[in-house]
């Protein structure tokens, strides 16, 4: 039953009347909408989508993301101008990857360890269950990393990216990308470091 309130000369209603119309206040306006009863939530498509979401959330929790990785995911979410947290962006990109028939055994790069930057170089090591050689993309802007650096086998972790020819006293942003055999990619968050003064 709807609750009707009548101050001086205005009327407002909220809740549902007769299981058909719903009255509410939305963005400062009194609105009425048809009550929608959700469709069967157990269709094959919905169960598949929920399975993909569950797999993405499970991967987030078992991947062993460090504080540096989590900060990078949040930085990426901020730089992408989406109203998402790093967690939500991770889950979204993983689900999109799986929908594109990506290899579920390929994981996004993680556990990044940024070496001590010199005035013109920096080496980053990371783990990534990648079928193909990962790449790193680096730039001086949060929103544009256009320089591609091919990664090599790492010394202590699985892979490493050696950034050279950098400018002194400059903040760089980079992300890492792992690939499956069909060239579907999984990217990391947006990491950062500042080179030393010359």
Where would I find each of the regions flagged by the language model?
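Long, polar/Ser/Thr-enriched low-complexity segments
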Residues: 1-109
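An aromatic-rich alpha-helical recognition segment common to small helix-rich domains
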Residues: 60, 126, 136, 175-176
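Short, solvent-exposed loop/linker segments at the N-terminal edge
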Residues: 114-118
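Conserved aromatic anchor
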Residues: 120-132
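Extracellular low-complexity, O-glycosylation-prone stalks/linkers
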Residues: 130-149
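Short S/T/G- and acidic-enriched coil/turn segments that sit immediately N-terminal to beta-strands
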Residues: 156-162
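Beta-strand-rich modules
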Residues: 164-185
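Extracellular fibronectin type III
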Residues: 181-198
């Amino acid at each position: 039953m709807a609750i009707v309130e009548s101050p001086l000369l205005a009327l407002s209603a909220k809740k549902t009347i007769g299981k058909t119309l719903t009255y509410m206040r939305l963005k400062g306006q009194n609105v009425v909408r048809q009550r929608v009863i959700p469709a069967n939530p157990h269709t094959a498509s919905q169960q598949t989508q929920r399975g993909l979401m569950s797999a993405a959330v499970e991967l987030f929790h078992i991947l062993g993301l460090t504080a540096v990785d989590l900060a990078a995911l949040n930085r990426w979410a901020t730089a992408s101008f989406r109203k998402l947290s790093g967690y939500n962006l991770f889950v979204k990109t993983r689900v999109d990857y799986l929908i594109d028939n990506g290899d579920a055994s390929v994981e996004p790069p993680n556990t990044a360890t940024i070496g001590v930057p010199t005035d013109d170089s920096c080496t980053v090591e990371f783990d990534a269950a990648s079928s193909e050689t990962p790449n790193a993309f680096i730039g001086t802007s949060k929103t544009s990393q256009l320089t591609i650096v091919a990664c090599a086998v790492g010394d202590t972790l699985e892979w490493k990216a050696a950034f050279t020819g950098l400018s002194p006293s400059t903040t760089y942003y980079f992300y890492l990308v792992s690939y499956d055999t069909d060239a579907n990619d999984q990217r990391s968050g947006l990491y950062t470091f500042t080179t030393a003064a010359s």
